[in-house]
Design a protein with these regions (language model features):
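Conserved ABC transporter NBD signature motif
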Residues: 82-93, 98
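Conserved ABC ATPase "signature" region
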Residues: 122, 126, 133-151
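Conserved ABC ATPase signature
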Residues: 155-159
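Conserved catalytic motifs of ABC-family nucleotide-binding domains
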Residues: 176
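Catalytic Walker B motif of ABC-type/P-loop ATPase nucleotide-binding domains
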Residues: 180-184
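Helical segment within the ABC ATPase nucleotide-binding domain
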Residues: 195-207
Length: 270
């Protein structure tokens, strides 16, 4: 199985995914999106894009607005300003078409602990209009990719935290989305489980050409070659390739770059 080179650069096998390479639309395009909860502005004119077949890190401390942004993209909240497009589909104008291209792993775990792994996946697939037989076949495929095929009949409550997260990713892939959103997916995991989860998602980008937006506050999950968006207090403070942020901030590592960008004197979005 192909994997990344640990520098954020996908292996040559990525060229075998024509739909990603040929896509004329970014996997996700957000333009001028703001959102408020009463008098508190959670997002302020946020704009960025995620290219098809790329790993993009949305980096920000807790409370930066990452979860609010995901709620807007997934239509849990309605965006009243700006536009959000998933593979060219406006989520307000064409919500069904947009959501059909989208897979999501939320920060809060949403699996039914009393159902088996297979039951969780099949139930999700039926919500997307898949028949039972095709849903079971697809479930076995995505579980094999996640090295969890042997746990298909186990109740979810008997899995480890890392295994539950891998099942949630498998569930998000059931309907073959072209964009995958992950909101702080490694929270609560040990170091080994966290590293395995990051590697699994990077393989999806490299092998299947899926566009990924990975929201995190953990610096170590970002690698050279990644595209990075720094979100702080609801505003995009910077965006660009990993190396671009180092040059812009005149720092030697992404942790120092991040700290300089979220300082009270940090500049506006690039």
């Amino acid at each position: 199985m192909a994997s990344s080179d640990h520098q954020g650069h996908p292996p040559p096998r990525r060229n075998l995914v024509p739909q990603a390479a040929a896509s004329l639309s970014p996997a996700l395009a957000i333009e001028g999106v703001s959102h408020s909860f009463g008098a508190r502005k959670a997002l302020d004119a946020v704009s960025f894009s995620v290219a098809a077949g790329s790993f993009t890190a949305l980096l920000g401390p807790n409370g930066a607005g990452k979860t609010t942004l995901f709620s807007l993209v997934t239509r849990l909240y309605e965006n009243r300003s700006g536009t959000i497009h998933v593979l060219g589909h406006d989520v307000r104008v064409e919500p069904a078409a947009a959501l059909a291209k989208l897979g999501v792993v939320f920060q809060a775990r949403t699996l039914d602990l009393e159902l088996s792994v297979m039951q969780n996946l099949v139930y999700h697939a039926t919500l997307h209009g898949m028949g039972f037989a095709s849903a079971r076949r697809r479930a076995l495929e995505v579980l094999a990719q996640a090295s969890l095929a042997e746990r298909a009949r186990d109740k979810v409550r008997n899995l480890s935290g890392g295994q539950m997260r891998r099942v949630e990713i498998a569930r998000a892939l059931m309907h073959r989305p072209r964009l995958l959103l992950l909101d702080e997916p490694t929270v609560g995991l040990d170091i080994a489980s966290r590293a395995a989860l990051v590697e699994q998602v990077r393989r999806l980008v490299a092998e299947e050409g899926i566009g990924v937006l990975w929201a995190t506050h953990i610096i170590e999950e970002i690698a050279p070659g990644d595209r990075v968006i720094v979100l702080h207090r609801g505003r995009v403070r910077a965006q660009g390739d990993y190396e671009d942020l180092l040059r812009r901030t005149a720092t030697e590592d992404i942790s120092a770059a991040f700290l300089s960008l979220v300082d009270d004197g940090a500049g506006e979005a690039a």
